[in-house]
From Swiss-Prot:
UniProt KW Glycoprotein keyword: no
Gene name of the encoded protein: RXLR76
Family assignment from sequence similarity: Belongs to the RxLR effector family.
Organism: Plasmopara viticola
Protein name: Secreted RxLR effector protein 76
Main location: secreted
Function: Secreted effector that partially suppresses the host cell death induced by cell death-inducing proteins.
Signal peptide limits: 1-21
Disulfide bonds: none
Region (Disordered) location: 105-142
Compartments, record wording: Secreted; Host nucleus
């Protein structure tokens, strides 16, 4: 469930200087072989906590209730809003069936000229019937069976053309369904976000981390960009220590100096940031949020398919 880690990191860098894992010192990656993807986010949320910005227990409790309940509810409802996978599978099966019929259709279409030729020969068949009494009648009768066979091919050719048309329509419908499914998913997730996030942000005390999360992380899900490059971890060798130090330094600038991600986590976070921008802090934040959006969206789709 990679998206959960990315969105958590984005919240850390964008919204709060106090988000961390159970140790209060470091983030922890999700282990794909430990938790099922469909339950990774919701099950792990209660096991994490949001440190109080003023180290007050009441403040901590408020943040924990507000932020994690919002995230869990948003994810649950967002998943429930996803289009039914069965409908998509059914459309794909229709398309597959139509495509399987295409070779037969093509073969029948090849015979179509014979059918047309047979149609042109039909008057000759009548003439053959009329001249049965002449010596050449026997020859005309011999030609009749192939003629009848060609005439029989005409309905098959028409049926084949219908199969080709249905295959084309099914392919077009499937492409249109994918676009509609994507739009429905985004709209549903956006509705869930507004429903669960807005009330919690309005009720949170000014200055609390949960209030800052609500006010600083403004995501319009239908505008999510999903064409980012794939995440790649780098081998954490001694020569990469400069990169690790740079990420830690960035964490101190944007977050809390005590937040120290592991070397493996740094390798992912490094690829999420935008180091070449003219304003690194600004571009770091923007790129992290976009990466989080992309991977959470992909995770939601994967959860629905399971």
């Amino acid at each position: 469930m990679s998206g959960a880690f990315y969105v958590f990191t984005a919240l850390l860098l964008v919204a709060s200087d106090q988000i961390a894992a159970e140790s209060g010192k470091r983030l922890e990656m999700y282990k794909h072989d430990v938790m099922a993807a469909s339950n990774a986010v919701v099950k792990s949320l209660p096991n994490r906590f949001l440190r109080g910005s003023r180290d007050e227990p009441d403040n901590l409790a408020n943040e924990e209730r507000t932020v994690y309940s919002v995230l869990a509810s948003m994810i649950n409802e967002g998943v429930s809003k996803m289009p039914c996978a069965a409908e998509v599978v059914e459309k794909i099966s229709h398309t597959t069936e139509a495509v399987e019929n295409m070779p037969r259709a093509a073969k029948a279409v090849k015979k179509r000229p014979r059918g047309a030729k047979a149609g042109r020969k039909m008057p000759r068949a009548a003439e053959a019937e009329a001249v049965k009494k002449v010596p050449r009648a026997g020859t005309a009768v011999k030609k009749a069976p192939p003629l009848a066979e060609d005439v029989k091919e005409m309905p098959r050719a028409k049926e084949a053309m219908e199969e080709l048309r249905r295959a084309a329509d099914a392919t077009e419908d499937m492409q249109r369904a994918k676009a509609n499914d994507l739009l429905k998913a985004l709209i549903g997730a956006d509705e869930a976000l507004k429903k669960h996030w807005t009330p919690s942000g309005n009720t949170a005390a000014i200055g609390d981390t949960s209030y800052d999360v609500f006010n600083k992380v403004i995501l319009s899900l239908p505008e999510w960009k999903i064409n980012f490059r794939g995440m790649k971890s780098m081998a954490v060798l001694d020569q990469h220590r400069e990169n690790i130090d740079l990420v830690h330094k960035t964490f101190e600038i944007l977050c809390d100096k005590n937040v120290k991600p592991t070397a493996a986590e740094v390798s992912f976070i490094w690829s999420m940031m935008e180091w070449k921008g003219p304003n690194p802090e600004k571009y770091h934040r923007r790129n992290l949020v976009r990466q989080a959006q992309r991977y959470v969206f992909l995770d939601l789709r994967n959860v629905k398919k399971r």
